[in-house]
From Swiss-Prot:
The gene is NAC26. One of its GO terms (molecular function) is DNA binding. Disruption phenotype: No visible phenotype under normal growth conditions. The double mutant nac20 and nac26 exhibit a floury grain phenotype due to decreased starch and storage protein content. Residues 147-157 have a biased composition (Pro residues). This is NAC domain-containing protein 26. The keyword Transcription regulation applies. It comes from Oryza sativa subsp. japonica (Rice).
Length: 333
């Protein structure tokens, strides 16, 4: 309870809604550089001092001056691994911090190098077989043009060098709010159109015009008979013989007993086809009788006859038959 009260007392008096979230350039310019110049006198309400080698990362949020944020800032001094060496000790009791990637250069006004940022990840266990965690640290330090020098002996009264101080930002990667992944709505399979048939909106009118221009217009004389005419034809053929005769040539006109009706350029057969063949057989029989009686009958030039020619042929056949009967009667007597 007493520790929580101390944490509340350490909180800076800021209006609601204010957050401490400086940029990399602001951290170097306004917080790290003044601390290096006056390490004892310079103090910031939002950044506390901590020894990272004696604290585990999950304990650091409780030691921050601004509690309740998703990232925490600390001043820390580098702990040399060896008194006369250059390597930094980054181990704790539970694990160690391991650098990852290259250091990032920080510029002022995009041309003046003022600092460097190093990214480290905390591993549980001992190197090199530690288990990686989601705790991440950004370590900010001033840029030094001169090569690094080993620290002075502990007996010296010389103040700490500028590369001994750093600003560390600690955060946990899983604590950030991730944006939900929006899955695009897909059309059902039966509603999807193949890619080959999808027409862009810009070319739709042009393609429709080309398609309409490519449609072949069927003339009236080439159109098929209507459904009612086809049914009538089937009805007429069904009343005739079971074996329907082959259709006559297209040049046929109207014949006795088997007229042809022209309707919109389509030829339709009307009547009983057997009547046409019976009449043809009768005409052939009459011609044979006339040839046997001594009459010379020439073969018709064409099977296509008009109604008037067919009537004349019938009258001629009747007259010839009467003449044959009269001749037979004369010769009989």
């Amino acid at each position: 309870m007493g520790e929580q009260q101390q944490q509340v007392e350490r909180q800076p008096d800021l209006p609601p809604g204010f957050r401490f979230h400086p940029t990399d350039e602001e951290i170097i310019t306004f917080y790290l550089a003044p601390k290096v110049v006056d390490s004892r006198g310079f103090c910031v309400a939002a950044i506390g001092e901590v020894d990272l080698n004696k604290c585990e990362p999950w304990d650091l949020p409780g030691k921050a001056k601004m509690n309740g944020e998703k990232e925490w800032y600390f001043y820390c001094q580098k702990d040399r691994k060896y008194p006369t060496g250059m390597r930094t000790n980054r181990a704790t009791e539970a694990g160690y911090w391991k650098a990852t990637g290259k250091d990032k250069e920080i510029f002022r006004n995009h041309h003046m190098l003022i600092g460097m940022k190093k990214t480290l990840v905390f591993y549980k266990g001992r190197a090199p077989k530690g288990d990686k965690t989601n705790w991440v640290m950004h370590e900010y330090r001033l840029a030094d043009a001169s090569p690094p020098q080993p620290p002075p002996p502990p007996s010296s009264a010389e103040p700490p060098r500028q590369d001994d101080w750093a600003v560390c930002r600690i955060f946990h990667k899983s604590s950030g709010i991730k944006k939900p992944v929006q899955v695009p709505m897909q059309m059902p399979m039966q509603m999807q159109m193949p890619v080959a048939h999808q027409v862009p909106a810009a070319n739709y009118q042009q393609q429709m015009a080309m398609a309409s221009a490519s449609i072949i217009q069927v003339p009236m004389q080439m159109q098929m008979p209507s459904m009612s005419d086809q049914l009538q034809m089937l009805d007429d053929f069904s009343t005739g013989s079971l074996m329907a005769p082959p259709p006559p040539p297209p040049s046929y006109s109207t014949l006795p007993g088997f007229p042809l009706q022209i309707n919109g350029g389509a030829q339709q057969f009307v009547g009983n086809p057997s009547m046409y063949y019976q009449q043809q057989q009768q005409q052939q029989q009459q011609q044979m009788d006339m040839a046997a009686g001594g009459f010379v009958v020439s073969e018709p030039s064409s099977l296509v006859v008009s109604p008037q020619d067919a009537a004349d042929q019938n009258n001629a056949a009747d007259i010839s038959s009467v003449a044959c009967n009269m001749d037979a009667t004369i010769w009989k007597y």
